């Protein structure tokens, strides 16, 4: 062997040694990443892992073996090729796993603002003196208590100010607008939280922020929901709550509480591929789980107090445990629809709504349309132009979800899947673990199998649910005003609960004993909860007594079963101690009604009447003297009709109580 050949052999052995180590390292990386794909094609995974492991063993034995006189260049090529393959396998899995992990945001940035009225003289934190400031009394609330307490401590606000604890933001806001409170700590999403309430439409200009503070926190530290279902297997029936957030933020890395603009509760049975889908009206009047005493209010207001409050409220009302949730904001929906290259839906009429940034208006035309992201947002958000308002919007949201599912099930390209993940991961948040998300692969696989063996277009049988109810104008105890609420029908709610529990295999199916159809009428799938029902349910609300006479008010009070007491006499009711439209079951004690004919008014009337009677007597006496022919004509007599009229009674009349 020549000197040159020896030198070439040493170089070749060196590269073989280096690439052997690289091959083993990349193979180990690939094996680790493949192990992460638990419960996905287990047999194939184990075969691949076995092949990679065996190859690594041979490479190690090759390195440890006796030196051969001749090293083949083909072996070096194999090592390079093997390293590239292993690196690509591991890299793709690493990327997908990382994107899926980012959907479950372990940490969120919360922001709390110290808010005051624009007319307040304070312009910065140093000006905050001799003020009454409100905070939430919920010690687990990052934006209502935890961060405010830090601001108070850092700026020594307790030294010169009074800190008052409240149960809810709305009561604080009412007191601040009513000048009973100088400032309040609230989430930086306060505009979207309150601008939809009558009287607070201009909250953005009515108020100003004195100081803001951000704090990044682990969600699990403030929420029990985050880890409640971490060990559940998605191969078993489960529930998931989809929440559409009224937020224009690009991502959900920053906490987006705002209003629960869209609430869709889904139960899914992976064994049967049956699902139920319920759109919960945002104005549903239900008990709010995180408020003291659990008073009824609009369900959308629960969103301002975090995921736990919203989820617990829905769980308790529908008597069903929610295993998972998924949140998406406006930007996320736009990105998702664009990522799947648009969706096909039927648009009933021309609809126009602001875009996701609220910068310009976007319109969609009637008919079967292929919509892009911004257009799909119009389809999902618009309600004011629809004949059935909110309920029409809920129907559109369900149709959009099904359109997205139909597009997603046709994706077979890994590159496209990675593109979608990359596009929407920042705008999604969930408590599903990465392992649980990966388990949906098997669900998708079952759907594909069914599609190959069936001509049925509906591969997943979706049973629509509808919460029937009636609208009522009810006095809001916290907002101190009358608001429109949607009062659910109890029978509808009962049927919905039964349907969800049946799909979750928690109760036995109810047998259908009656069925009818007609060849003259096409079959329509029944919507559970829609009714019709023989009876509805509404609350008895206190009437408006103003403008009624005492007798009319007494009769109306008797009709409504309330006790009233009157102050003053005569005239009509000008004031009542309890607001109209308040629920009568919330009223304790007597309702005081003030009549327009008060003591002073009655005395003035008596005085005028006496003066008029005296004038009449004087005129008659003059006529007698002038005539002197009328004798003792006493037909006029002493007109005592004025008399001592004591209808005014005491200066401080006691109320009369009538039932």
Q: What does each of the following model-derived ranges do?
A:
Residues 6-10:
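Short, Lys/Arg-rich cytosolic juxtamembrane segment immediately N-terminal
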Residues 11-63:
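Membrane-embedded alpha-helical segments of integral membrane proteins
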Residues 71-95:
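Internal/C-terminal transmembrane anchor helices
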Residues 103-104, 110, 116-118, 124-535:
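Non-catalytic, solvent-exposed segments at the cell envelope interface
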Residues 89-107:
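Hydrophobic alpha-helical transmembrane segments in integral membrane proteins
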Residues 505-659:
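Ligand-recognition elements built from short beta-strands and adjacent flexible loops
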Residues 1-5:
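Short, Lys/Arg-rich, polar N-terminal cytosolic tail immediately upstream
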Residues 61-71:
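Cytoplasmic membrane-interface regions of multi-pass membrane proteins
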């Amino acid at each position: 062997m020549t000197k040159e050949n020896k030198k070439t052999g040493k170089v070749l052995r060196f590269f073989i040694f280096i690439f052997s180590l690289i091959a083993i390292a990349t193979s180990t990386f690939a094996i680790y990443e493949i192990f992460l794909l638990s419960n996905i094609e287990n047999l194939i995974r184990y075969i691949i892992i076995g092949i990679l492991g065996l190859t690594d063993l041979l490479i190690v034995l090759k390195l440890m073996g006796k030196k051969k006189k001749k090293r083949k260049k083909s072996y070096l090529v194999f090592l390079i090729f093997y390293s590239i393959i292993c690196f690509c396998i591991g890299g793709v899995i690493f990327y997908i796993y990382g994107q899926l992990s980012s959907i479950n945001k372990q940490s969120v940035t919360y922001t709390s603002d110290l808010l005051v009225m624009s007319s307040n003289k304070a312009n910065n934190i140093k000006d905050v003196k001799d003020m009454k400031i409100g905070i939430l009394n919920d010690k687990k609330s990052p934006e209502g208590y935890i961060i405010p307490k830090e601001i108070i401590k850092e700026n020594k606000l307790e030294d010169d100010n009074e800190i008052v604890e409240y149960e809810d933001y709305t009561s604080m806001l009412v007191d601040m607008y009513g000048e009973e409170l100088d400032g309040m700590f609230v989430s930086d999403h306060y505009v979207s939280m309150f601008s939809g309430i009558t009287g607070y439409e201009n909250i953005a200009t009515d108020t100003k922020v004195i100081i803001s503070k951000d704090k990044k926190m682990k969600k699990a530290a403030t929420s029990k929901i985050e880890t409640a279902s971490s060990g559940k297997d998605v191969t078993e029936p489960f529930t998931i709550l989809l929440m559409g957030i009224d937020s224009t933020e690009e991502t959900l890395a920053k906490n987006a509480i705002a209003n629960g603009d869209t609430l869709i509760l889904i139960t899914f049975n992976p064994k049967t591929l049956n699902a139920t889908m319920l759109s919960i009206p945002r104005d549903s009047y239900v008990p709010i789980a995180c408020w003291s005493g659990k008073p009824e209010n609009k369900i959308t207001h629960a969103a301002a107090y975090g995921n736990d409050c919203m989820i617990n409220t829905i769980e308790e009302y529908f008597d069903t445990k929610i295993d998972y949730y998924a949140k998406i904001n406006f930007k996320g929906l736009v990105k998702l629809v664009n990522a799947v290259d648009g969706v096909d839906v039927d648009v009933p009429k021309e609809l126009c709504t602001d875009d996701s940034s609220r910068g310009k208006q976007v319109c969609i035309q009637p008919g079967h349309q292929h919509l892009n992201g911004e257009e799909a947002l119009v389809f999902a958000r618009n309600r004011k132009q629809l004949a059935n308002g909110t309920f029409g919007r809920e129907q559109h949201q369900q149709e959009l979800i099904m359109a997205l599912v139909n597009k997603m099930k046709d994706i077979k390209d890994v590159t496209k899947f990675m593109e979608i993940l990359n596009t929407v991961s920042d705008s999604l948040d969930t408590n599903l673990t990465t392992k649980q998300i990966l388990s949906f692969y098997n669900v998708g696989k079952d759907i594909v199998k069914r599609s190959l063996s069936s001509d049925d277009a509906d591969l997943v049988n979706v049973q629509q649910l509808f919460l029937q109810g009636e609208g009522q104008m009810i006095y809001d105890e916290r907002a101190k005003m009358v608001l429109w609420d949607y009062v659910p029908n109890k029978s509808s709610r009962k049927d919905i609960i039964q349907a969800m529990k049946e799909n979750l295999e928690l109760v036995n199916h109810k047998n259908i004993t009656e069925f009818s159809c007609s060849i003259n009428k096409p079959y329509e799938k029944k919507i559970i909860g829609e009714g019709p029902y023989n009876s509805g349910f509404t609350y008895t609300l206190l009437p408006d007594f103003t403008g009624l006479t005492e007798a009319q008010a007494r009769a109306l009070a008797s009709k409504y079963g309330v006790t009233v007491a009157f102050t003053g006499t005569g005239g009509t009711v000008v004031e009542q101690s309890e607001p109209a439209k308040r629920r009568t079951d919330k009223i304790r004690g007597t309702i005081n009604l003030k009549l327009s004919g008060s003591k002073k008014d009655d005395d003035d009337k008596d005085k005028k009447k006496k003066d008029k009677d005296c004038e009449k007597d004087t005129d008659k006496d003059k006529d007698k003297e002038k005539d002197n022919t009328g004798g003792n004509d006493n037909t006029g007599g002493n007109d005592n009709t004025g008399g001592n009229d004591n209808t005014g009674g005491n200066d401080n009349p006691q109320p009369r109580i009538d039932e």
